[in-house]
Amino acid sequence: MKKRYFAGAAVAAMILTAGMATTSFADWSQQNGKWYYYNDNNGRLVRNDWVCSKDAWYYMDYNGVMQTNSLIDDTYYVNENGVMITNTWKYINNSRWNESGWRYFGANGKAYTNGWKQINDVWYHFTDSVLDIGWVEIDGKIYHLEDSGAMTTGWRKLADREDDWGEYWYYFNSSGKLIYDGELKISGETYIFDHSGRMLT
């Protein structure tokens, strides 16, 4: 992400949060309901670049229009006021690429990408920036992720991961890995699990 800081835009955020009622102020300019930003150093319209105004980041497209409610470069997201979001979850409907789902944008505004990420002491897994849920196989190990995306641990009664017929008891260790094809002593009791991880009675 290429970011530039324009000191002349220090008051622009006040305009945006006030409903953008003013048509022009400092280096921001509203034209036909769209916002543009002119570089205070040379007066040129900013295109395909980021603008920082009072510690908030805004993205201007190839026409110089400030973007709102948009995913930028499949990495950042700007809200209804055009501000890049940070440290928050956002559900993005990206049906064009079949990648709709929850994403988490970190302190630098970037969406978490592939792999395990810990957020507020909870483990989540992402594939192509989208939060995974349900049964997943990662590096040859089987895990289950709750509807919230949180990694499952301990005992859990779930639909069969292979044929989806009925519900069975499964056990996931402290690392979230499914126990299967063997036996394990849990709280003093020995349990046997089949090849798919179902507890056998």
Each predicted region: which residue ranges?
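Extracellular adhesion/carbohydrate-binding repeat motifs centered on closely spaced tryptophans
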Residues: 2-201
